[in-house]
Swiss-Prot record:
Designated name of the protein: S-adenosylmethionine sensor upstream of mTORC1
Biased composition (Basic and acidic residues): 25-34
An example Gene Ontology CC term for this record: cytosol
Annotated phenotype, changing R95A: Abolished binding to S-adenosyl-L-methionine without affecting ability to associate with GATOR1 and KICSTOR complexes
HAMAP family reported in the protein's UniProt record: BMT2
EC category: transferase
Coiled coil: none
Assembly description: Interacts with the DEPDC5 subunit of the GATOR1 complex; interaction is disrupted when SAMTOR binds S-adenosyl-L-methionine. Interacts with the KICSTOR complex; interaction is disrupted when SAMTOR binds S-adenosyl-L-methionine.
Lineage: Eukaryota, Metazoa, Chordata, Craniata, Vertebrata
Protein purpose: S-adenosyl-L-methionine-binding protein that acts as an inhibitor of mTORC1 signaling via interaction with the GATOR1 and KICSTOR complexes. Acts as a sensor of S-adenosyl-L-methionine to signal methionine sufficiency to mTORC1: in presence of methionine, binds S-adenosyl-L-methionine, leading to disrupt interaction with the GATOR1 and KICSTOR complexes and promote mTORC1 signaling. Upon methionine starvation, S-adenosyl-L-methionine levels are reduced, thereby promoting the association with GATOR1 and KICSTOR, leading to inhibit mTORC1 signaling.
Superkingdom to which the source organism belongs: Eukaryota
Originating species: Homo sapiens
Length: 405
């Protein structure tokens, strides 16, 4: 060997770095992502901590909405995460793309018609299998069958209404990700918008008015002329309402319940509520929680149309099947069923979960990644008559979707 060759080879190897060491640019990107996700998670933790200490979620939320500095910092961090980090690490599992895909399937590719056909078959079957009904129940069922009949002019109009643009309300929109899709007439709202195209609106305190008695093109024109900020909206205005990473933001299950109830009132009959909520555990670990959410949301007058599990989130689509909310809060605590694992953490648990105190090891990351699989839609599709299995609830300390590494 040429003298000094060994030394030169060693130097080259050192310059190249270990094969397991990410390049400097990648390290910088990960550090920035951890910093941004720390901003977001600290806001969530502070809200939950205040809720445990005070208990008055109205007061806590009012103070939170007045803290403009924190809200602006949160909005900038979320937009940066979405623009520069999530889009690069979620290929094939994008939440926005999933929402668009479900809307196309439902409104443009026959999904809505198939769901309504199943409703009609179930109603007909109920008349054959149910013992003698009293006169009131019988007249109710006959009315339901009339509404479902494919010869009913109103039913045909309902099917054709979405032939124009799909009116979509994106709650907690931040940076208005649906604006770029031509098939949507999008209204994005947020308590602190990150871009000018998003309207300022506190959805929890949004006032609802009587539905507009206007033609479809007139309703579209109304939406294009909304004033900023938005304090009130007519009911039955949208074909789609999106809650993307929204419900876990709130510290109280009752606040999540209020959001779902308002979504029901804002949707047209057979409109879709799309819910995405973070969860990095394997597909069955929080099955009990998802079953609980399904029961609570369906009690409002929804029926689940689709469910998917991605590596870092649950994705659910519910269709509005009744004009009135039907939930009976006397016999069952439906709001309490919209829980998240963090609701059960103590203040000490939240403080321990601070990223500066604990960072998951590479081995733990690999073990976590090993359990990541996508849950197929069909077996857990309510419209197919299937149900979801339950499992023991698992308490998580963080919102793992924020660190998609």
């Amino acid at each position: 060997m040429e003298p000094g060759a060994g030394g030169r080879n060693t130097a080259r190897a050192q310059r190249a770095g270990s094969p397991n060491t990410p390049p400097p640019r990648e390290q910088e990107r990960k550090l920035e992502q951890e910093k941004l996700s720390g901003v977001v998670k600290s806001v969530h933790r502070r809200l939950r901590k205040k809720y445990r200490e005070v208990g008055d979620f109205d007061k806590i939320w009012r103070e939170h909405c007045e803290d403009e500095e924190t809200l602006c910092e949160y909005a900038v961090a979320m937009k940066n995460l979405a623009d520069n980090h999530w889009a690069k690490t979620c290929e094939g599992e994008g939440r926005i793309e999933w929402c668009c895909s479900v809307c196309r399937e439902y409104f443009q590719n026959g999904g809505k018609r198939k769901a309504l056909e199943k409703d009609e078959k179930r109603a007909v079957l109920a008349t054959k299998t149910t013992p003698a009904l009293n006169m009131h129940e019988s007249s109710q069922l006959e009315g339901h069958l009339t509404n479902l009949s494919f010869t009913n002019p109103e039913f045909i109009t309902e099917l054709l209404q979405a032939s124009g643009k799909i009116r979509l309300l994106d709650v907690g929109s931040c940076f208005n990700p649906f604006l770029k899709f031509e098939e949507f007439l999008t209204v994005g709202i947020d308590i602190v918008p990150a871009v000018e195209s998003v309207y300022k609106c506190d959805f929890l305190n949004l006032q609802l008015q009587q539905p507009l008695q206007l033609a479809q093109d007139a309703i579209d024109a109304f939406l294009k002329q909304l004033k900023n900020p938005i304090d009130s909206l007519p009911g039955e205005l949208f074909h789609v309402v999106v809650f993307s990473l929204l419900l876990s933001y709130f510290p109280s299950p009752y606040q999540r319940w209020i959001c779902c109830k308002k979504a029901h009132e804002l949707l047209v009959l057979n409109g879709l509520l799309l819910i995405i909520t973070p969860d990095s555990s394997h597909q069955n670990r929080h099955a009990m929680m998802m079953k609980s959410w399904k029961i609570a949301i369906e009690s409002l007058g929804f029926k689940r149309f689709k469910y998917s599990k991605f590596s870092h989130m649950h994705l659910m689509a519910f269709r509005k099947i009744s004009l009135k909310t039907t939930s009976d809060l006397v016999s069952r605590n439906y709001p309490g069923m919209l829980y998240i694992p963090q609701d059960f953490n103590s203040i000490e648990d939240e403080e321990y979960s601070n990223p500066s105190c604990y960072v998951r090891s590479d081995i733990e990351d690999e073990q976590l990644a090993y359990g990541f699989t996508e849950l197929p839609d069909a077996p857990y599709d309510s419209d197919s008559g299937e149900s979801q299995a339950s499992s023991i609830p698992f308490y998580e300390l963080e919102d793992p979707i924020l660190l998609l590494s």
